[in-house]
């Protein structure tokens, strides 16, 4: 009798999973644990978890729907450079301290416009550029080193006031230093780390590598673009150093995620800094070593407007220093000790973030959301 009862209990517990797998649907319970709304935020669900609930899923023929509103949500399969799918990415809105339910269903998904993109730009001196629906950036390559008058090191910003992807159009027309309605490049990098690049820092000096030498795209939209930039070894105060940067940008975000992996011929850790170019005229700064937070609202640049730049660590900074040309946030790197941070920019003429207050509020909210991620349960 007891064995029969146990068997029945096991069958009952397995029945919902069996029904879910056979019906071709999975319910995703989503909860927001913080007291602020989350807009256009990406969540990542391990693909193996999806396969466990929906083993027969057709990866090219499913859609994700909000059970309450019946609205279809955009999604992306993330590979991270691997042959097999790693994550299902879903972009969603969810109100403060609230819960929603989504459903994965069989069927042809709606067409959604790509919101992220990146590429190597051989026609422009080996740039590597990336963007989303909010902002665009580029890193400089080997080709630029042949033009000393134009030479620059750090991360550049291309401001936008459109949610359309603009990189290819701007490179094609060549003159992207004038705003023809969608934004422009007026940000000056020069011999600085620009809008949040990273480099070793020893004896009050930034040790810049040469510009990046190799690139690899791991994922390229529509909701997340991820790529790797690799650099040649260089000497840092008697230490030989290498770095590889894995950079990703999500749709709807002003900031990119950077994972910088440094290696050295010496075992000891060493200081590195994340830098933001500082202008001669006064701007507004919000610096917090304990929070690992560096925000800068630049002075207005004539008719071109104002750019806000910011960088965030998830751990406290060792120190933050203001020099003549840069804001520098120091942390520690070493072999097998990646530095993970977020950095990006905003433009007041996009009419979303229009003041130092709204920029600093955005940065603080961004970090709060990182520390309190959306919770996901597959039912």
Tell me the role of every PLM-derived stretch.
Residues 82-123, 272-284, 293-304, 311, ...:
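Extended acidic/polar, glycine-enriched regions
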Residues 103, 108-206:
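Solvent-exposed N-terminal domain segments of exported/luminal and surface proteins
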């Amino acid at each position: 009798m007891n064995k029969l009862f146990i068997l029945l209990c096991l069958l009952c517990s397995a029945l919902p999973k069996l029904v879910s797998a056979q019906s071709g649907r999975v319910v995703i319970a989503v909860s927001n644990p913080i007291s602020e709304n989350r807009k256009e935020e990406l969540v990542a669900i391990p693909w193996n978890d999806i396969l466990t609930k929906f083993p027969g899923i057709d990866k090219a023929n499913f859609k994700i729907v909000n059970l309450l509103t019946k609205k279809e949500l955009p999604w992306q399969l993330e590979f991270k450079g691997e042959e097999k799918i790693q994550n299902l990415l879903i972009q969603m809105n969810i109100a403060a301290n609230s819960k929603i339910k989504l459903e994965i269903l069989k069927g042809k998904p709606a067409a959604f416009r790509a919101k992220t993109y990146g590429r190597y730009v051989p026609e422009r001196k080996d740039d590597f550029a990336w963007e989303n629906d909010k902002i665009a950036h580029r890193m400089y390559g080997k080709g630029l080193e042949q033009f000393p008058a134009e030479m620059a090191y750090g991360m550049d910003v291309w401001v936008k006031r459109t949610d359309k992807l603009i990189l290819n159009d701007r490179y094609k027309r060549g003159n992207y230093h004038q705003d023809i309605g969608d934004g422009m490049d007026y940000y000056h990098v020069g011999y600085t780390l620009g809008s949040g690049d990273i480099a070793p820092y020893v004896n009050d000096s930034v040790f810049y590598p040469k510009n990046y030498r190799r690139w690899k795209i791991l994922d390229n939209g529509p909701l997340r673009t991820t790529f790797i930039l690799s650099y040649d070894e260089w000497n840092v105060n008697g230490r030989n150093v290498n770095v590889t940067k894995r950079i990703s940008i999500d749709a709807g975000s002003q900031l990119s995620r950077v994972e910088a992996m440094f290696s050295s011929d010496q075992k000891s850790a060493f200081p590195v800094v994340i830098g933001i170019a500082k202008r001669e005229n006064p701007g507004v700064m919000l610096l917090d070593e304990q929070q690992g937070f560096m925000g800068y609202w630049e002075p207005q640049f004539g008719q071109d407007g104002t750019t806000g730049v910011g960088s965030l660590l998830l751990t406290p900074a060792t120190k933050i220093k203001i020099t003549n040309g840069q804001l520098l946030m120091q942390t520690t790197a070493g072999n097998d000790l990646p530095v993970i941070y977020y950095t990006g920019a905003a433009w007041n003429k996009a009419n979303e973030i229009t003041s130092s207050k709204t920029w600093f509020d955005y940065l603080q909210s961004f970090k709060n959301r990182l520390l309190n991620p959306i919770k996901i349960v597959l039912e």
